[in-house]
């Protein structure tokens, strides 16, 4: 746990908020892995104005980390120093604007795809296959089933570390595969997506196909962090992992999924270290057998606690 005195001193240095500040807040319940350490301070802003004021008033030396719904996130046992920001209800808005969909970045990807479908807007069906929030999709150029965020984004609204708002166009995001080139200190709060008029029943049919495909090929009903590694150019990570003999491989309470071996699973009592160590073992075996270095897609944050450490 974080040192109580240091945490109290940190909170004293933070500005007053309308949202919620929680000291030594457990983050494991906020991640799909259900493993990991605590945030020194967790901030849940009431809305974008609350977030902007908080960032403007927070000393520059205080580390700030933003998280979403935790679907593609691993929090190390040593915890996350400084302030962890998690956007909530004030950032879940979804509105239809002509042939566009405007969404807050805490809105779930599946909710955005559903809103577009109900409005008869095609093009956002792929979000049905991404188990995360819009903020994560913006930051990682989230994609599935042949489409990516870069294919549908019109603009994104963000707040920088000084509390200033910015509107970024698609080009400003400098998207590449599973990567956004926008400054790391920007916190996205809203996005506008372009749809195309379509038949609502046809759109729903495609979304249901995506759901069926996910259920048949991915361990979606387990404690998992989604796709573990990015696909290297010219390769599929799961094929490299399978060829390296890693399907079903275990370390502590962590396991490589038997169903889809680019997914790591918490079988019930895995620590964050179990999960990360298993991922590194997979990377080493793939490197040895194929010469390819896998790059993590799961975001890992916090301080690593060495085994046997206090």
Swiss-Prot record:
One of its GO terms (biological process) is regulation of cell shape. Belongs to the MurB family. Its main location: cytoplasm. SUPFAM superfamilies: FAD-binding/transporter-associated domain-like (SSF56176), Uridine diphospho-N-Acetylenolpyruvylglucosamine reductase, MurB, C-terminal domain (SSF56194). This is UDP-N-acetylenolpyruvoylglucosamine reductase. Cell wall formation. Its EC number is 1.3.1.98. It comes from Parvibaculum lavamentivorans (strain DS-1 / DSM 13023 / NCIMB 13966). The active site is at residues 178, 227, 297. It is found in: Cytoplasm. Gene3D superfamilies: 3.30.465.10, UDP-N-acetylenolpyruvoylglucosamine reductase, C-terminal domain (3.90.78.10), Uridine Diphospho-n-acetylenolpyruvylglucosamine Reductase, domain 2 (3.30.43.10). It catalyses: UDP-N-acetyl-alpha-D-muramate + NADP(+) = UDP-N-acetyl-3-O-(1-carboxyvinyl)-alpha-D-glucosamine + NADPH + H(+). NCBIfam families: murB, PRK13905.1. Residues 34-213 form the FAD-binding PCMH-type domain. Pathway: Cell wall biogenesis; peptidoglycan biosynthesis. One of its GO terms (cellular component) is cytosol. Its cofactor is FAD. GO terms for molecular function: FAD binding; UDP-N-acetylmuramate dehydrogenase activity. Keywords: Cell cycle, Cell division, Cell shape, Cell wall biogenesis/degradation, Cytoplasm, FAD, Flavoprotein, NADP, Oxidoreductase, Peptidoglycan synthesis. InterPro entries: FAD-bd_PCMH (IPR016166), FAD-bd_PCMH-like_sf (IPR036318), FAD-bd_PCMH_sub1 (IPR016167), FAD-bd_PCMH_sub2 (IPR016169), MurB (IPR003170), MurB_C (IPR011601), MurB_C_sf (IPR036635), Oxid_FAD_bind_N (IPR006094).
């Amino acid at each position: 746990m974080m040192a109580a005195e240091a945490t109290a001193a940190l909170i004293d240095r933070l500005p007053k908020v309308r949202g919620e500040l929680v000291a030594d807040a457990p983050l494991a319940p906020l991640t799909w892995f259900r493993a990991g350490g605590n945030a020194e301070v967790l901030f849940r802003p009431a809305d974008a104005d609350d977030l902007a004021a908080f960032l403007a008033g927070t000393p520059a030396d205080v580390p700030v980390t933003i998280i979403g719904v935790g679907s593609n996130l691993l929090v190390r046992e040593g915890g996350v120093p400084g302030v962890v920001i998690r956007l909530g209800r004030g950032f879940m808005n979804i509105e239809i604007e002509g042939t566009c969909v405007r969404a807050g970045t805490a809105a779930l990807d599946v909710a955005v795809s559903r809103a577009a479908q109900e409005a008869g807007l095609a093009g956002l069906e792929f979000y049905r296959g991404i188990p995360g929030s819009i903020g994560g999709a913006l930051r990682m150029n989230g994609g599935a089933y042949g489409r990516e965020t870069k294919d549908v984004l019109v603009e994104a609204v963000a707040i920088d570390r000084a509390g200033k708002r910015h509107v970024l166009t698609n080009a400003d995001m400098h998207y590449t595969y599973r990567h956004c080139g926008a400054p790391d200190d920007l916190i996205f709060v809203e996005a506008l997506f372009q749809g195309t008029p379509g038949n609502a029943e046809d759109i729903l049919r495609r979304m249901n196909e995506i759901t069926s495909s996910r259920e048949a090929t991915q361990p979606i009903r387990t404690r998992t962090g989604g796709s573990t590694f990015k696909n290297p150019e010219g390769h599929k990570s799961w094929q490299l992992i399978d060829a390296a003999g890693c399907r079903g491989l275990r370390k502590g309470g962590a396991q490589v999924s038997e169903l889809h071996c680019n997914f790591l699973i918490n079988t019930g009592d895995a620590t964050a270290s179990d999960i990360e160590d298993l991922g590194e073992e997979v990377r080493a075996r793939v490197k040895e057998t194929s010469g390819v270095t896998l790059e993590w897609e799961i975001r890992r944050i916090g301080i690593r606690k060495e085994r046997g450490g206090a």
